[in-house]
Swiss-Prot record:
This is Velvet complex subunit 2. InterPro entries: Velvet (IPR021740), Velvet_dom (IPR037525), Velvet_dom_sf (IPR038491). Gene3D superfamilies: Velvet domain. It comes from Botryotinia fuckeliana (strain B05.10). Residues 1-95, 205-312, 426-451 are annotated as: Disordered. It is found in: Nucleus; Cytoplasm. GO terms for cellular component: cytoplasm; nucleus. The lineage of its organism: Eukaryota, Fungi, Dikarya, Ascomycota, Pezizomycotina. Component of the heterotrimeric velvet complex composed of LAE1, VEL1 and VEL2; VEL1 acting as a bridging protein between LAE1 and VEL2. Forms a heterodimeric complex with VOS1; the formation of the VEL2-VOS1 complex is light-dependent. Residues 18-28, 40-62, 205-217 have a biased composition (Polar residues). GO terms for biological process: sporulation resulting in formation of a cellular spore.
């Protein structure tokens, strides 16, 4: 068999899109060597020749990314090449349904808020309240649909909390606690470290503190002979409080401790571990197994897990954005005397401080029984799925702590205009009641006094 050593890789080893032209002088190498086909110097020389050719080719490539193709529209080019770039504003989205395009626009942006923490008693809304306007455009004519010809009774706007860059939602926050919480989902119990000794929790109820010479399942009262805190919670009933001949108490229990009812009972289950009913109990000292507590002998090899090696509970998840997270549509008049379909979200609060955005999503939950050509067309509730017809993001607003909060924003003309039309928007007073209205020093009191 004749074998040829190539000074450059064959043509079929590289895709055509990434392989330079073979007619390029920088890529072509000299003629094949005439020595032994598997000679080590020739192999090393061919590799060096190939690397040098590719280094020259890569150095000739431009460093910057090529511009987007010219045949793409400008909007598609930006969306396909600018997604996830830092500092880019998230763009609104809208879809066309039945020849109509729905568009959302935040006319009044949120600016700042005071964090409300994890209690619901002292909750401060975002100021100024976000006001979103809905516009519906006919695709055929390009004109906006008259508000009086739109049935808005089933229009709903949902809001959720997003990060300042608009890349991820931050609707949930973990409520951290200093003391661990007991949960049925945690298979082990968590105890406090006392006297510098390592605290352990047993996966199998009744397992001894030290490895016994024989399998034992007895336990004494929690405060006898234990080098660490036992399971927290209510007192446990000692099932094997009276020792059997030839057995050792795993917790150093008192052998004279009488059984609670005069006879031996099956071991009690722990509040933190529930074994599967398909397991069986091993017999020890030729005793019959207890059918009420079965498990296999292989389970005896399960050791105790130190708390430092487990994931302690970090608290429960709760919503970061609280309040009225949805709003119905209203036909309102703005300060310029123009009628439109508006969504006002005046009851939104954030638990934690930081920079955030609000994302608004518009959904029509109604199913019209007739074409929406007049305001009297009846609608029924959609019991299936409803698509998000439009969505948009607000500008970045800041949530302050209680000490750093500069105060609520002055009421805007738009808020005052909507308040006169029956929308429940908190309006700041003009301070006509005098300085005594506020604190003891004559200054304005807390923000609650201004509403």
């Amino acid at each position: 068999m004749n074998t040829t050593a190539y000074a450059s890789p064959p043509r079929d080893m590289h895709p055509r899109s990434t392989m330079p032209s073979l007619h390029d002088t920088t890529y072509r190498s000299g003629p094949p060597h005439q020595g032994a086909p598997y000679s080590m110097p020739q192999t090393m020389a061919s590799q060096h020749s190939t690397i040098s050719a590719y280094e020259q080719y890569n150095n000739s490539l431009p460093v910057s990314r090529p511009p987007p193709p010219e045949h793409l529209p400008s909007s598609e080019a930006v969306s396909s090449f600018s997604i996830g770039l830092p500092g880019q504003e998230p763009s609104p989205r809208s879809i066309t349904v039945d020849g109509r395009k729905y568009t959302l626009e935040v006319q009044q942006q949120p600016k700042r808020a005071r964090m409300c923490g994890f209690g619901d008693k002292d909750r401060r809304p975002i100021t100024p309240p976000p006001c979103v306007k809905l516009s519906i455009t006919e695709i055929a004519t390009g004109k906006e649909v008259d508000v009086n010809n739109i049935e808005h009774g089933m229009f709903v706007l949902n809001v959720d909390l997003w990060s300042a860059d608009g890349e991820r939602p931050v609707n949930l926050v973990r409520h951290s606690q200093t003391s661990p919480s007991i949960s049925a989902t945690v298979p082990v119990s968590y105890t406090q470290i006392q006297g510098g000794a390592a605290a352990y929790s047993s996966l199998l109820p009744g397992q001894s503190q030290r490895e016994p010479t024989s399998p034992t399942y007895g336990s004494a009262p929690p405060f006898q002979g234990a080098g660490f805190s036992p399971f927290p919670g209510p007192p446990q009933v000692s099932a094997y409080s009276q020792q059997q001949p030839g057995q050792q108490s795993g917790y150093g229990g008192n052998p004279n401790y009488p059984p609670p009812n005069g006879y031996q009972v099956a071991p009690q289950q722990s509040n933190y571990y529930y074994p599967q009913p398909s397991q069986s109990i091993p017999s020890h000292n030729n005793q019959d197994p207890y059918p009420s507590r079965p498990f296999t002998p292989q389970d005896l090899g399960i050791g105790r897990i130190p708390i430092s090696q487990t994931n302690p509970p970090q608290g429960m998840f709760t919503r970061n954005l609280i309040g009225s997270l949805s709003a119905s549509a209203f036909r309102l008049t703005d300060p310029d005397d123009r009628i439109g379909i508006w969504f006002v979200l005046q009851d939104l609060s954030v638990r934690t401080e930081g920079d955030f955005r609000l994302r608004f999503s518009f959904v029509n939950v109604g199913v019209p029984s007739a074409p929406q050509n007049n305001a009297n067309s009846s609608c029924s509730v959609n019991t299936g799925k409803a698509p998000v017809l439009a969505s948009c993001f607000s500008e970045v607003f800041k949530v302050y702590s209680a000490k750093k909060f500069p105060g609520v924003v002055e009421s805007t003309p738009l808020s005052k205009c909507f308040a006169t039309q029956g929308i429940k928007i908190p309006i700041r007073k003009d301070g006509k009641d005098g300085p005594g209205k506020g604190g003891k020093d004559g200054s304005r009191g807390d923000d609650d006094d201004d509403y």
